[in-house]
């Protein structure tokens, strides 16, 4: 047929590897509007999002602000691990605390505590409303609540809270559904609604701010408790078991095992041990570019795969090590294998430069894409803006760059514990009742973990990703640079998604399930483009022009 070629023919009858720009999709029949396109997808076996975008766990891309922004837009962020465990845990908790259903671990104080304690909580964590119980802990008898209105004009910060708290309270009584509690909160016109049991003991809290966020961000990715989804990266080092345990207890919805070459005994053993300790914890393995690599990780029990090796804009693995694969070819073959062996979701990681690349990655079988360079330079990315040759930019670097390896700090074995009433302690959700048995499962070192003991605990997450922690000479597999200011992800992600929706409409696929069905059935057609065809398909023959991403 002259109307293009199916993917099977393109990828299995040539010795060449293809990138996204080498391919173009053939149009289909349009019988629906662009607003009818649904991009809901899975990023692991059990984790669903409404936008197929995940931010990369890089130290110049994803910390809590980026993770919050991505989740509000319907995707998810993955907190990088080029930092101490305690700090990474705190980053995860900031995402989880940004939006809540029932707040099950609120900061709580006693009547004898002072106004200064409330100020410390507000300064450190941003919360200005604090329930007051007789014990200063969740589960104590509720006596009142202190809000910013109660203490705004007080000059004596040593004033006991018993003198300023509001004791005439509107409360919800357990058991209560979240919808009922939210309606009660609306009717009360209060900022917070404490939830109590029959003994008037505090069991939870809900916030009016969350009702506003629900209205403003209807696509937001949330867990069963209506908190934003967030992932966190861990390395394959043996002691990162403790990091993984701390992140799981902090509420991370998925752990991403961060390695440039995922088919290693270290990653296989780590995945098996994590699955033994936390059977319900979702784990994304990688990175992989071949079916053989994918098989190793799927057999180990991963719930999702990252695809890509050397295709990122700041990655030099293919040049330095001569190992990797063209990204479009890697995505097609790995996704095909994963689909046929357990239907494991795949994330295309690397090489994404525009919304068209996102569309092509999804069309080749990916369930979502992971973005680094496209999100770097946004307001939510870590780092400060500066001017380079008159252009406002932010630093962006590969995790294999020497700068990233040097930037890592010494890891701590575990984060500090947090008492529910202590304003100075790090916030965390309570550990589950099965914690002791899980900890013992984690502490049993596997043979390969013992053989890896020489991988010292002082190395950085970045160095561990490239197996370079204990090397006298570190070979960079990435570079450091800068990217232009892109504004906020609150505008960038909707622009990208709208472009993808138009692409879906053009080929006649309402959902990603429809798109993948067309791919498997051969109805989805592609052409391979020559260099001249690629130039023709972009802006050309103009004296000058201005390329704007969105209006």
UniProtKB/Swiss-Prot annotation:
Pathway: Purine metabolism; XMP biosynthesis via de novo pathway; XMP from IMP: step 1/1. SMART domains: CBS (SM00116), IMPDH (SM01240). IMP binds at residues 313, 349-351, 372-373, 396-400, 477. It catalyses: IMP + NAD(+) + H2O = XMP + NADH + H(+). InterPro entries: Aldolase_TIM, CBS_dom, CBS_dom_sf, IMP_DH, IMP_DH/GMP_Rdtase_CS, IMP_DH_GMPRt. It is found in: Cytoplasm. Its cofactor is K(+). K(+) binds at residues 310, 312, 315, 536-537. NAD(+) binds at residues 258-260, 308-310. One of its GO terms (biological process) is GTP biosynthetic process. Mycophenolic acid (MPA) is a non-competitive inhibitor that prevents formation of the closed enzyme conformation by binding to the same site as the amobile flap. In contrast, mizoribine monophosphate (MZP) is a competitive inhibitor that induces the closed conformation. MPA is a potent inhibitor of mammalian IMPDHs but a poor inhibitor of the bacterial enzymes. MZP is a more potent inhibitor of bacterial IMPDH. Potently inhibited by MPA and adenine dinucleotide analogs such as thiazole-4-carboxamide adenine dinucleotide (TAD). One of its GO terms (molecular function) is metal ion binding. GO terms for cellular component: cytoplasm. Pfam families: CBS, IMPDH. CDD domains: CBS_pair_IMPDH (cd04601), IMPDH (cd00381). It comes from the Eukaryota. Its main location: cytoplasm. Gene3D superfamilies: Aldolase class I (3.20.20.70). Residues 102-163, 165-221 form the CBS domain. Residues 422-462 have a biased composition (Low complexity). PROSITE patterns: CBS, IMP_DH_GMP_RED. It is an enzyme of class 1 (oxidoreductase). HAMAP family: IMPDH. Belongs to the IMPDH/GMPR family. Catalyzes the conversion of inosine 5'-phosphate (IMP) to xanthosine 5'-phosphate (XMP), the first committed and rate-limiting step in the de novo synthesis of guanine nucleotides, and therefore plays an important role in the regulation of cell growth. This is Inosine-5'-monophosphate dehydrogenase. It comes from Toxoplasma gondii.
């Amino acid at each position: 047929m002259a109307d293009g070629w199916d993917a099977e023919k393109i990828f299995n009858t040539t010795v060449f590897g293809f990138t996204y720009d080498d391919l173009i999709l053939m149009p289909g029949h349009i019988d629906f509007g662009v607003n009818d396109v649904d991009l809901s997808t899975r990023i692991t076996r059990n984790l669903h999002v409404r936008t197929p975008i995940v931010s990369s766990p890089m130290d110049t891309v994803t910390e809590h602000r980026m993770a919050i922004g991505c989740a509000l837009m319907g995707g998810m962020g993955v907190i990088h691990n080029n930092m101490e465990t305690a700090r990474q845990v705190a980053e995860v908790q900031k995402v989880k605390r940004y939006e809540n259903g029932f707040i099950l671990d609120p900061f709580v104080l006693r009547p004898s505590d002072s106004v200064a304690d409330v100020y410390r909580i507000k300064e450190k964590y941003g919360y200005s409303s604090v329930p007051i119980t007789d014990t200063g802990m969740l589960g104590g008898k509720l006596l009142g609540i202190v809000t910013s209105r109660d203490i705004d004009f007080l000059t004596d910060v040593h004033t006991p809270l018993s003198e300023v708290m509001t004791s005439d309270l509107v409360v919800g009584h357990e058991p209560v559904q979240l919808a009922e509690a939210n309606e009660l909160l609306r009717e009360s016109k209060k900022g917070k609604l404490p939830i109590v049991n029959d003994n008037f003991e505090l069991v939870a809290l809900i916030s009016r701010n969350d009702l506003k966020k629900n209205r403003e961000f209807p696509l937001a990715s949330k867990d069963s408790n209506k908190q934003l989804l967030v992932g966190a990266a861990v390395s394959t080092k043996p002691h990162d078991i403790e990091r993984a345990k701390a992140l799981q207890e902090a509420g991370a919805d998925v752990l991403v095992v961060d390695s440039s070459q995922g088919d290693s005994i270290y990653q296989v053993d780590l995945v098996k041990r994590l699955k033994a300790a936390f059977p319900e914890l979702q784990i994304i393995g990688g990175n992989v570019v071949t079916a053989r690599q994918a098989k190793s990780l799927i057999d180990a029990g991963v719930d999702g795969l990252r695809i890509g090796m050397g295709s990122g804009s700041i990655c030099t693995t293919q040049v330095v090590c001569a190992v990797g694969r063209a990204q479009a070819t890697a995505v097609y073959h790995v996704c095909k294998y994963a689909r046929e062996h357990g239907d494991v979701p795949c994330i295309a990681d690397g090489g994404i430069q525009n919304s068209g690349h996102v569309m092509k990655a999804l069309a080749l079988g990916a369930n979502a894409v992971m973005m680094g360079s496209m999100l770097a330079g946004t307001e939510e990315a870590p780092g400060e803006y500066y001017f380079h040759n008159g252009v406002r930019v932010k630093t962006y670097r590969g995790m294999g760059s020497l700068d990233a390896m040097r930037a890592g700090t010494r890891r701590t074995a575990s984060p500090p514990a947090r008492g529910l009433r202590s304003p100075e302690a790090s916030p965390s959700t309570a550990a589950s009742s099965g914690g002791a048995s899980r900890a013992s499962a984690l502490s049993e070192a596997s043979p390969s973990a013992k053989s890896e003991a020489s991988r010292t605990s002082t190395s950085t997450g970045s160095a561990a990703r490239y197996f370079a922690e204990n090397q006298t000479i570190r070979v960079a597999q990435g570079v450091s640079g800068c990217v232009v200011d892109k504004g906020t992800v609150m505008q960038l992600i909707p622009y990208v998604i709208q472009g993808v929706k138009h692409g879906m409409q053009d080929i006649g696929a309402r959902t990603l399930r429809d798109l993948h069905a067309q791919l498997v059935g051969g109805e989805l057609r592609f052409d391979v483009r020559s260099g001249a065809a690629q130039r023709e398909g972009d802006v050309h023959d103009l004296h000058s022009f201005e390329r704007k991403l969105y209006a």
